[in-house]
Amino acid sequence: MEGEQLQTAPYNPRFPQQNQTKHCWANYVDYYGCVKHYNGDNSKCQTFFNSMNSLCPAAWISEWDEQKAADLFPSDRV
């Protein structure tokens, strides 16, 4: 990780508690919803992507990606 700059997601008043599970979920759904809205152009969705990768464990993202691929993900926004 040498030379890689780590950043955490900025404060979001919708999620004031320390438990950031819902914040992680919201950024995952918001990122893929944004990409869907812009027809695959993820350059406009970078804020959601950075927050998602900062807050969510890689195992969760991987699991949700598998659910999306199998059309089992529990949100119609992605």
From Swiss-Prot:
InterPro entries listed in its UniProt record: COX6B-like, CX6/COA6-like_sf, Cyt_c_oxidase_su6B
Disulfide bonding pattern of the chain: 24-56, 34-45
Keyword list, A-Z: Disulfide bond, Membrane, Mitochondrion, Mitochondrion inner membrane
Main localization category: mitochondrion
Keyword Nucleus among UniProt keywords: no
Family from the record: Belongs to the cytochrome c oxidase subunit 6B family.
Function summary: Component of the cytochrome c oxidase, the last enzyme in the mitochondrial electron transport chain which drives oxidative phosphorylation. The respiratory chain contains 3 multisubunit complexes succinate dehydrogenase (complex II, CII), ubiquinol-cytochrome c oxidoreductase (cytochrome b-c1 complex, complex III, CIII) and cytochrome c oxidase (complex IV, CIV), that cooperate to transfer electrons derived from NADH and succinate to molecular oxygen, creating an electrochemical gradient over the inner membrane that drives transmembrane transport and the ATP synthase.
Stated name of the protein: Probable cytochrome c oxidase subunit 6B
